[in-house]
Design a protein with these regions (language model features):
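ADP-ribose/NAD+-binding catalytic cleft of ART/PARP-like enzymes
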Residues: 1-33, 47
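Conserved NAD+-utilizing ADP-ribose enzyme module
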Residues: 25-31, 39-153
Length: 153
């Protein structure tokens, strides 16, 4: 299993060392950090990207980093599965959380993400155009209704 985590490149990229600014991008909710499940072959990555985009008021391009479950578990980080808050209802259960109860876990996760970002294969950029095409296809294929996304343009 792979996970996708949205991130702000201006806080991470071009840095040789991890710093507090990068870690500030790892906002928590009840000591959890949000991630989305992606198939190992990344066959559902477009739908997952759309689910992430539909957590916001409008569709915007974004960067995400691919995380591997075996690496997460090697760091002894625990998962806390909770439905995602997205208008893409069919994918709400593809959401998960990484538990980070202390600064140690946040630090481990930040180091791992930073390492993953150093390999371009692990960094994904989803353009607004791509996301809108994904949305069009999802509506066309009855994966999501127009009523569910009426506020999303």
């Amino acid at each position: 299993m792979l996970y996708l985590r949205k991130y702000a490149p201006e806080l991470w990229d071009e840095k040789c060392e991890l710093d507090a600014v990068s870690i500030s991008d790892l906002k928590t909710n009840d000591n959890d950090i949000s991630v989305w499940q992606v198939a190992n072959d990344e066959s559902n990555i477009g739908d997952i990207a759309l689910a992430i985009a539909l957590t916001r008021d409008r569709i915007q391009d974004f960067y995400a980093v691919v995380l591997k479950d075996e690496d997460i578990f090697t760091k002894e980080l625990q998962m806390n599965p909770l439905p995602g808050e997205t208008k893409y209802e069919n994918l709400r259960n593809e959401h998960n959380n990484i538990k980070v109860p202390t600064f140690w876990e946040i630090g481990y996760l930040a180091e791992y993400m930073h390492k993953q970002m150093s390999n371009d294969d692990n960094v994904k950029y989803f353009t607004e155009r791509f996301l809108k095409e994904q949305l069009y296809q999802a509506v066309k294929n009855n994966k999501i209704s127009q009523e569910d996304i009426r506020d999303k343009k």
